Each structure stands twice: as structure tokens, then as C-alpha cells.
């Protein structure tokens, strides 16, 4: 192994896919190897997420600049980890967390800390001349994830009348990531044609999915079914449906209701949708505070549907352990910037997997062309990935990276058995 220590760290302000500033961090080692990371940012965020550092006292970018976070990288984090072995990921992450000193990384900013954390891993991989997935996952990193493709956007990701945030497809009948991407692209373009024929907008939302003005969530699901069929696939066999309700966005904390409905009624609505449509995954079907509701939702649908916690867990190992202990959900969405370091992200993945929960590596609505999450999905055999639609370069970059990894692996590549919660099985 080539010995290498951190020799330099540079950071600068760049723009994400929504036109807001974020960080680009570059770590250089004593051997001259370089690792880079570009940090994403979310629009729909959980209350217990690690906090970004934004220049709220400045008029630049409407108070969303990250110049102070850039300064924190250069003046605090770099001197702190300078000279550390680039392979000591957990040590470097611990030093940064200790220096920050807050439970949610608000002192220095999760965006600053994550940028250094991920760039360090890239630098280590570059020093060893290995791809990131192989450096992190070793020889067992050969499983490609089934993508969850967000084709219709609603909620906080679009300016339309849809209550739910994401209407996704899962190409469960694919035999490779290359075929899965092909299937998704076929449905995407078929859906675009259908929307155009109906005089509906084909403009896209933050995550590359269409954002038409539809009357109901059911209308969105019907359109997806029609697009799947017209593209030549069988719903529930070749391609299943998935939802991200982002229920916290329409939950009233004071009354404990969802647009006036109690959690039993909300669960009944979701259960009814699963009976009528080939839905095999529901994310954030209830609000993050509604533990009683989550327990019931998991009891009612957890045997046949993937019940995904995003805001519920925010990639936080403590919250994941609590959820496991209380029987909440059966799947964890993994977003590195929710927790703020690679070490904690990996721990969250392993905790979920050891408990028998499925895992989904996920992007954010404010993305860059950084493809780290594609490598993470393969490195830790996550099984699934959420990285948006089949449009917008910051989304497509992740699919392209996955196909590149599949080609690199050759005969060793395995496409994940994505029928863990298959619609067909639930019909038996």
C-alpha cells in the first residue's frame, strides 16, 4: 500500500442543480493523488438532519451562500487533518466531528465536513489506483442496485397540484443496470409523448421528472401505468411503482392530522392504493414524528410493501436503532449529507442491513454531477438507488456511472434481485 497523508485541501463555492451554492472540495495527498467531492443539498429535509452552514447574514444568493463553509474547510478542517493518513477515514471523520462539537454539525457545517470526508475517500482510492467502490467495498463490491426512477414530481419538488412528492418506477424485470436504464428511458419518453398528446406540460421538476398539473395522485399513477404498457412492459412484472409521499409536508403537528385525516385514514388510503396499483415501495408515508402511525403502517403493509423511512431516520444511526427497536419501517433511505460523514453513512447502512432492513442510496433535489452515491451503492451492496429521472445531467450522471461500473466488473457484475417486496408475490 502506498503511504499517503493529506497535504492540501482546497474548497470553493459552486452551484447545484437548483442554482444555489454548494461546496466543491479537493483533497491532495503527499503522493500527488487528488480526490474531489461536490456536496448535494435537499429541499424536503427532515427536522433532525445534520445542518448545512449557509451565509444567512449576507444578501448574496438570497442568504444561501457557502463562503463561510468554504472558509471553515480551509482554516479549520484542513489544519486539523493535515498530515493524517488518507486511509484513516474514521479517524479523520472523528476529528472533524469533535472539532465541530455539536450533535448536528451546525458549528462548522455538515456541508463542509461531508465535502472533506468524501474527498478524502476519493483521494485514498486514487492513491491506490482503484475505483471508489472497490476501495470501500473490497472484492465483494459487485452488486449493481435496482434504480427507483422518479418520473412524475409533485409536492415540494414541483409547482403543481400533486400531494405526493415522487411517483417512481422500479424496473424489477431487468437483468442488468444497462437494461434497467434502457427500460426507464423507454417509459420516460413514452410518458412525455402521452403528456404532450393530452396538452399537459412536459416541463420537469427538480429531479428531472415531469411536473404536469394533474387532478390527483391517482391520475399520476394511471399515467405511469399507461406509459409502462405503451412502452411494451407489464406493470407489476417488468416494472413496479413506488411512492415518496413526503407526508411531513402535509402533516399538522398541532392536530396530528394529514390534511385533516388521522393516521388510520392516511394508512387506509395508502393500503387502498397498493390494492389497486402495483406499488411495492412507499417512502415517508407518514410524518417523522408520528411513531404510532409508523408502527401501524409497518404492521399493515410491511409484509408486502417496502416501507421506507427517510425523514424518519435521516441516515442517523441512533434513530435507525430506535426505529428497529420499535418496529418502524422495513427500509432505510441513505443520504450522506443528512448525517455529514462517510463513516456515519457506512455505519447507518450496516445497521439497517444487519437488522434485515433494505437500504436505498439516495440523491438530493439539489444535486451536482458528482457520482459518489453510485459507487457507494455498489461498495456496500445497497440493493437500490434513488437518483431521479432520465433527464437532467446531474441525475443521468449517476446512471452513466453505474453502467460504467457494470462494464468494469464484467462477468463479476450482479444485478440486485429487486423483487424483495414484489407485487406478484403479494398477489399470491
UniProtKB/Swiss-Prot annotation:
One of the record's GO cellular component terms: cell surface
Catalytic EC class: lyase
Single GO molecular function: phosphopyruvate hydratase activity
EC numbers, comma separated: 4.2.1.11
Protein keywords: Cytoplasm, Glycolysis, Lyase, Magnesium, Metal-binding, Secreted
Tree of life domain: Bacteria
Pathway recorded for this protein: Carbohydrate degradation; glycolysis; pyruvate from D-glyceraldehyde 3-phosphate: step 4/5
Segments passing through the bilayer: none
Note on how the cofactor is bound: Binds a second Mg(2+) ion via substrate during catalysis.
Subcellular location(s) of the protein: Cytoplasm; Secreted; Cell surface
Any one Pfam family match given in the protein's UniProt record, by short name: Enolase_C
Binding site for (2R)-2-phosphoglycerate: 165, 335, 364-365, 386
Catalytic activity annotation: (2R)-2-phosphoglycerate = phosphoenolpyruvate + H2O
Free-text function comment from the UniProt entry: Catalyzes the reversible conversion of 2-phosphoglycerate (2-PG) into phosphoenolpyruvate (PEP). It is essential for the degradation of carbohydrates via glycolysis.
Catalytic residues (UniProt): 207 (proton donor), 335 (proton acceptor)
Protein name, as recorded: Enolase
Family to which the UniProt record says this protein belongs: Belongs to the enolase family.
Lineage per the UniProt record: Bacteria, Pseudomonadati, Chlamydiota, Chlamydiia, Chlamydiales
Necessary cofactors: Mg(2+)
Record-listed Mg(2+) binding positions: 244, 283, 310
GO biological process, one term: glycolytic process
The keyword Amino-acid biosynthesis appears for this protein: no
